[in-house]
A protein has these predicted regions:
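Cleavable N-terminal signal peptides of Sec/SRP-targeted secreted and luminal proteins
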Residues: 7-23
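Glycine-rich phosphate-binding loop and adjacent beta-alpha segment
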Residues: 203, 248-321, 354-365
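Short amphipathic alpha-helix with an adjacent loop that forms part of the alpha/beta core around
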Residues: 225-235
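C-terminal capping/lid region of NAD(P)-dependent oxidoreductase domains
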Residues: 28, 319-328, 336-365
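Mid-domain Rossmann-like dinucleotide-binding core that forms the NAD(H)/NADP(H) cofactor-binding site
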Residues: 147-223
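NAD(P)H dinucleotide-binding glycine-rich loop of Rossmann-like/cofactor-binding domains
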Residues: 73, 84, 113-176
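Glycine-rich beta-strand-centered segment in the early N-terminal region that forms part
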Residues: 49-67, 78-121, 365
């Protein structure tokens, strides 16, 4: 009987240990957007390991994330993540600090409501990020609004101030004026005391940009916009162009830009090929063309960008001077539909992904 009792005890212990092992393994897993290279129908939600924390990294429990053009390109195999970064989609996230890695400062604590620029990994339940890139979610802002800030607002801020060097009184031409970056850029131009003109693909999108502060808007589907831009600037042209289109807009951009203008190229939605008398026109107008991206920039550069943004722009979200523009939200399980919507150019502003579908749980861990 004693032997039977011992065997039963051992069996129960084995069962308990096995259950604990399964539970521990499960605790280290998370849901995340996964994909097979191709169309938006190839996106799905799968179980993957939670990210491990490195030196000075914070683990965010993600409430909301968002999608960007870069995500759709990565899904197609055209824009891989930088070396060493997560291959999970998502360049921004909002949530709470779940844990802190070795070497973190005392600036952040577990439970803090934060948003962050990411190099990848945002479309998941947890994401690791350098603590230097964390930003506090402004008072009174929910997670959906917060997820619409990091990638597009920091991109627009970089384009205008770190690269384009926009000055008070200048005029900026913003292509894709109703996109996430576009709606942020329009507001940032006004904040800088400059004037913006936008292009967009519908009157409704132009109306949105104008409501945010754009002085004029032109429908690129209705012919050459460059003469309209010249008319709007009394023949001078614009001082700065924020160009996400590239090749197909070259001639019109060249006509619309002022002498000594700064042309900031950050996307190639219209292709990367141009032909003809390219350099002579640039020389005649003394135009400077700068290509730029943000995702592959160094941590030092991104940290400086985040620090400047927090000082110069973040307070204006609290005052209501600027605001993130949300088009719609999708649950993580419907991320394929979100990609499809973006690729059909249906959105004005941001498409947000809800990982936790209860926007009232602001402090839940």
């Amino acid at each position: 009987m004693v032997e039977v009792h011992v065997l039963v005890q051992r069996y129960i212990l084995c069962v308990l240990l096995s259950a604990h092992a399964v539970s521990s393994a499960t605790d280290k897993m998370m849901r995340a957007a996964q994909f097979e290279k191709g169309g938006p129908e190839n996106l799905y939600v799968g179980e993957v390991a939670r990210p491990a924390l490195g030196e000075r990294q914070a683990l965010i429990k993600v409430h909301t994330s968002a999608i960007n053009r870069a995500d759709t390109l990565q899904r197609k195999g055209l824009y891989p993540p930088p070396p060493g970064e997560s291959d999970i989609l998502g360049l921004e996230a909002a949530g709470v600090v779940d844990s802190l890695g070795p070497g973190c400062s005392e600036k952040w604590k577990i439970g803090d409501r934060v948003m962050s620029l990411l190099s990848g990994g945002g479309n998941s339940e947890y994401v690791a990020t350098p603590e230097q890139l964390l930003m506090p979610i402004p008072e009174g802002m929910d997670y959906i609004q917060a997820a619409a800030i990091p990638e597009v607002w920091l991109t627009a801020y970089q384009l205008l101030h770190f690269v384009g060097k926009v000055q008070t009184g200048e005029t900026v031409l913003i292509h894709g004026g109703a996109s996430g970056v576009g709606t942020a850029a329009v507001q940032l131009v006004s904040l800088a005391g400059a004037k913006s003109i936008v292009t967009a693909g519908s009157e409704a999108k132009i109306a949105t940009a104008v409501s945010l502060g754009a002085s004029k808007g032109f429908n690129y589907k209705e012919g050459d916009f460059s003469q309209k831009v010249l008319d709007a600037t009394n023949g001078k042209g614009v001082d700065v162009i924020l160009d996400c289109v590239g090749g197909s807009y070259y001639e019109q951009n060249m006509n619309a830009i002022a002498v000594d203008g700064r042309w900031v190229l950050y996307g190639l939605m219209g292709g990367g090929t141009i032909s003809g008398d390219v350099f002579a026109k640039l020389l005649r107008k003394r135009v400077s063309v700068t290509g730029t991206t943000l995702r592959a920039r160094s941590l030092e550069y991104k940290s400086q960008l985040v620090g400047s943004f927090m000082q110069e722009v973040l307070p204006h979200f609290i005052s209501g001077k600027v605001k993130p523009i949300i088009f719609t939200t999708f649950p993580l399980e419907k991320i394929g539909d979100a990609h499809k919507m973006m690729e059909e150019n249906k959105n004005t502003g941001k498409i947000v992904i809800e990982v936790i579908q209860d926007r009232d749980k602001k402090d839940e861990l």
